[in-house]
Amino acid sequence: MRTTYMAKPGEVERKWYVIDATGVSLGRLSSEVASILRGKNKPQFTPHIDTGDFVIIINAGKIGLTGKKATDKIYYRHSQYPGGLKSRTAGEMRTNNPEKLLELSIKGMLPKNSLGRQLFKKLHVYGGSEHEHAAQKPEVYELRG
């Protein structure tokens, strides 16, 4: 009888991918990046092992928001002090802090446990077209669709 293949942490080969976010829809990009971080695009995917690759996203400030999300989608945060609720629209976040906009979107698509936190550390988001990971020789990743 055959047993199910389970990847071991030591035998996982990781690649570095660079993705250009110019004009790409936020949700479509986020779901694909979450899948790469998780390793679901590999045949040796194992749910409880980090089999994913590293992802560099450039031009985060040029991400696309469809419909009226730029004005209607609101992100909330709270300082834990009375009256400390802060809110920002997606358009304001895209202008002021585009890296945070993408990170929040991708983090919400990863597991909510210690593995998810480990996967999130392999994501690097940059607002401009320059990144500091040239030494890793990242491959350009073409998005599906």
From Swiss-Prot:
The keyword Ribonucleoprotein is assigned to this record: yes
Coiled coil: none
Alphabetic keyword roster: Ribonucleoprotein, Ribosomal protein
InterPro entries according to UniProt: Ribosomal_uL13 (IPR005822), Ribosomal_uL13_bac-type (IPR005823), Ribosomal_uL13_CS (IPR023563), Ribosomal_uL13_sf (IPR036899)
Residue ranges crossing the lipid bilayer per the database entry: none
Gene Ontology annotations for the cellular component aspect, listed alphabetically: cytosolic large ribosomal subunit
Record-level Gene Ontology MF annotations: mRNA binding; structural constituent of ribosome
GO biological process: negative regulation of translation; translation
Keyword Ribosomal protein: yes
One protein family per Pfam: Ribosomal_L13
General function of this protein: This protein is one of the early assembly proteins of the 50S ribosomal subunit, although it is not seen to bind rRNA by itself. It is important during the early stages of 50S assembly.
Subunit structure, as described in the record: Part of the 50S ribosomal subunit.
UniProt similarity note: Belongs to the universal ribosomal protein uL13 family.
Record's protein name: Large ribosomal subunit protein uL13
Phylogenetic lineage: Bacteria, Bacillati, Bacillota, Bacilli, Bacillales
Gene, per the UniProt record: rplM
